[in-house]
């Protein structure tokens, strides 16, 4: 690796070479492990592909000729191999070094024209530079956007998107390509004369009024810049762990150079609960407030501290997260990121030095959460130290690098620095660089990245959540019919509603017997079950009801393609085991018991596996469906994410997509599982409320609905509805 690269990149390069070499021979078992997609920044949706010995671009399809191995070779250079035939290497034809030299695949020789330097840019893209022509780069000629477009060498020019490439790990790895150069610190402080730096004012007070952390007291310092006049909302810089004079000078300098907008600083220490008698230890709240991964601290900042500061000091503070930055080191670093994570609308810019992503209070799970949750509009500048802290909670140096890799994996706009030193080394030294990066382009809004690869298979760029309807007393147990109409129960209001193909909600049944869930069979007939009435009802297309079975209370109901119904029931005795029933021809048969609290159900598109959610655990169970409707081969199969402050995932409703993905409505949002069990994607709704129902529907079957108490959210996705009306459909294995 290049001598100027941070140590972790030098080490990871060696391990990547070994790893990639080993997995090449096992391609049939894990086709994407270690492989990358190389896509032109100038042609979204296109990727580099091998067409015989020729190299061109094609529409992304996941084909083998669009997958590449990137393997470190000599110093800062690497070789790029097509995954379908690693004996060939990407090369400049004939060793050419002129504009227009075509790119080809050649038998490996180690020639300079086969060695490439991958230089990472500030925007996350890469220049691919051949060893024999360092002034040239891999070029999407004229920004071609059609399959078969010419790929050649061209003179490198900063900002030319034709020469920029997105290099994305497909599976198994999330680190940068092994020979990629970090952009590193190219920040040059803006020079300014000392007399041009205007000095701001400092105010100090103790805050003792917290309801989130009752009884605590804490020191707070306010910095008011000389440029502040109150005529418009000022930006906010919130610093955890209190005030240091150096940051006042840094703020004054950055505001004077206009690298930061006019910004009011709020420096707050963690709270402590004083003991009733002197001579003993107080209750130190720092770990509780800072290392906890709930939203308590950000709510304290947003609902208590900042309004108090604005009110008591007559300050016009912006409430927009795009105008706010939050900063800290160690536990103060993780709480800064946690604040932005829970409320990016309150803080969208984060500086965290030696962040404590360790197992104090669940912070060690953050790298995984960043990979699974849909990316959020957060820009971050993170650092770690070569001799960082290590204790029973974990190794800061390793876990900080895990956060680095996770943020890259999910496409976040961020920078990461490894600093020579100990815990929180370089915080002040990197402060100006961090602020320049975090505030670049302001007031342009910080945008969310593209999310992780598996999420990109579900969501559609630019198609976020929209409020579909609101004002209900409850929304439960949704289902769609073959046309794409979606039905759901408002149990509290004793109604069943329909979302028609125009997206409008109308009343379908005025008196539903407190139906708790609906389902629709292959013929379009709607069925309901109730936890109160004890009646299993059917309704025709006009909403006329008929009692199918009396004496059965149930949580959820599901129609099969074979004229049968499954019902989950939890009885009326506390802690009694739940039951799954199969109903056919008016008769009920107990087919399973033992779950803590059985809730939603779904049948896979190939119609032989039934999923049943346990709402009082983190599990969804899987069963084989026998021909007579009985169940066999029960496994606690799908683990769901449980937030640190929750006791269970709270799965209420589940459904499948035609493509074979399982969607679960949970406390954390909609969790989407791979066919073999793991949760790969989590889609929270905009107000972060619990999702109690999930369904795919709409005229094309590609609208995802999330039911959340009194609201319903919707968004277009790359998945499609399936139900009892659907034919048997083959399910393919989900990528890792």
Residue ranges and their predicted role:
Residues 30-175:
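Lectin-like carbohydrate-binding module/patch detector with strong preference for beta-trefoil
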Residues 94, 623-630, 717-723:
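Short loop/turn segments immediately following beta-strands, especially the blade-tip
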Residues 176-447:
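Non-catalytic cap/lid and distal C-terminal segments of serine-dependent acyl enzymes
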Residues 448-464, 579:
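Blade/loop signatures of beta-propeller domains
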Residues 464-469, 504-509, 544-549, 587-593, ...:
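A short beta-strand motif characteristic of beta-propeller blades
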Residues 470-485, 511-530, 534-535, 551-579, ...:
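Beta-rich, blade/repeat-based domains predominating
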Residues 491, 531, 570-572, 615, ...:
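Short loop/turn segments immediately following the C-termini of beta-strands
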Residues 695-736:
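Blade-level signature of beta-propeller repeat domains, shared across WD40, Kelch, NHL, RCC1
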């Amino acid at each position: 690796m290049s001598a100027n690269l941070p140590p972790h990149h030098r080490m990871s390069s060696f391990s990547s070479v070994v790893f990639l070499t080993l997995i090449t021979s096992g391609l049939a078992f894990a086709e994407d492990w270690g492989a990358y997609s190389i896509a032109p920044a100038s042609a979204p949706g296109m990727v580099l592909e091998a067409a015989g010995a020729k190299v061109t671009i094609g529409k992304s399809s996941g084909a083998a000729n669009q997958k590449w191995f990137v393997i470190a070779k000599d110093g800062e250079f690497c070789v790029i191999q097509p995954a379908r035939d690693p004996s060939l290497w990407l090369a400049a034809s004939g060793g050419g070094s002129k504009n227009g030299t075509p790119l080809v695949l050649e038998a490996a020789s180690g020639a300079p024209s086969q060695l490439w330097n991958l230089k990472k840019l500030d925007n996350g893209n890469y220049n691919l530079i051949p060893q024999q022509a360092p002034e040239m780069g891999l070029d999407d000629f004229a920004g071609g956007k059609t399959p078969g477009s010419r790929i050649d060498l061209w003179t490198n020019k900063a900002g030319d998107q034709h020469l920029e490439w997105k290099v994305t790990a497909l599976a198994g790895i999330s680190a940068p390509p092994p020979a990629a150069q970090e952009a590193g610190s190219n920040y040059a402080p803006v020079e300014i004369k000392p007399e041009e730096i205007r000095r701001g004012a400092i105010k100090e007070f103790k805050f003792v009024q917290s309801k989130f952390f009752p009884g605590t007291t804490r020191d707070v310092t306010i910095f008011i810049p000389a440029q502040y006049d109150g005529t418009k909302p000022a930006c906010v810089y919130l610093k955890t762990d209190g005030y240091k004079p150096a940051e006042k000078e840094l703020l004054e300098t950055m505001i004077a150079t206009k690298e930061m907008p006019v910004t009011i600083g709020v420096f707050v220490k963690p709270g402590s609960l004083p003991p009733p008698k002197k001579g003993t230890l107080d209750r130190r709240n720092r770990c509780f407030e800072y290392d906890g991964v709930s939203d308590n601290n950000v709510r304290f900042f947003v609902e208590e501290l900042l309004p108090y500061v604005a009110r008591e000091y007559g300050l016009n503070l912006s409430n927009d997260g795009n105008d706010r930055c939050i900063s800290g080191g160690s536990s103060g670093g993780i709480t800064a990121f946690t604040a932005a994570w829970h409320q990016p609308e309150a803080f969208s810019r984060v500086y965290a030095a030696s962040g404590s992503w360790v197992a104090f209070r669940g912070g060690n799970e953050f790298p995984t959460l960043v990979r699974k949750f849909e990316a959020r509009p957060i820009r971050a500048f993170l650092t770690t130290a070569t001799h960082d802290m290590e204790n029973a909670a974990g190794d800061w140096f390793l876990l900080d690098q895990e956060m680095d890799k996770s943020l890259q994996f999910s496409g976040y706009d961020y920078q990461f620095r490894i600093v020579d030193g100990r815990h929180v080394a370089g915080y002040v030294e990197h402060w100006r660089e961090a602020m320049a990066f975090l505030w670049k382009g302001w007031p342009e809004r910080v945008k969310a990245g593209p999310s992780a690869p598996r999420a990109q298979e579900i969501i559609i760029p630019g198609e976020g959540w929209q409020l579909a309807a609101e004002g209900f007393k409850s929304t439960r147990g949704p289902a769609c019919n073959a046309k794409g109409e979606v039905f759901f129960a408002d149990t509290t209001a004793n109604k069943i509603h329909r979302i028609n193909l125009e997206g409008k909600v109308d009343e379908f049944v005025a008196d539903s017997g407190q139906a708790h869930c609906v389902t629709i069979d292959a013929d379009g007939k709607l069925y309901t079950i109730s936890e109160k009435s004890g009646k299993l009802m059917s309704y025709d297309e006009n909403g006329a009801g008929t009692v199918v079975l009396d004496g059965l209370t149930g949580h959820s109901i599901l129609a099969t393609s074979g004229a049968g119904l499954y019902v989950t029931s939890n009885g009326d005795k506390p802690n009694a085991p739940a039951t799954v029933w199969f109903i056919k021809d008016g008769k009920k048969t107990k087919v399973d018991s033992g779950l803590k609290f059985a809730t939603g159900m779904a049948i896979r598109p190939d119609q032989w596996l039934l999923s049943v959610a346990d709402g009082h655990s983190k599990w969804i169970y899987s069963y084989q469906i026998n021909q007579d409707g009985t169940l066999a081969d029960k496994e606690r199969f799908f683990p769901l994410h449980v937030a640190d402050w929750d006791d269970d995932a709270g799965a209420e409703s589940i459904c499948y997509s035609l493509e074979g993905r399982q969607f679960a409505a949970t406390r954390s949002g909609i969790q989407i599982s791979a066919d073999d069990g793991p949760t790969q994607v989590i889609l929270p709704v905009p107000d972060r409320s619990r999702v109690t129902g999930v369904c795919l529907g709409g005229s094309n079957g590609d609208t995802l609905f999330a039911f959340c108490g009194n609201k319903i959210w919707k968004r277009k996705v790359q998945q499609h509805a399936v139900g009892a009306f659907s034919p048997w459909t083959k399910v393919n294995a989900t990528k890792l």
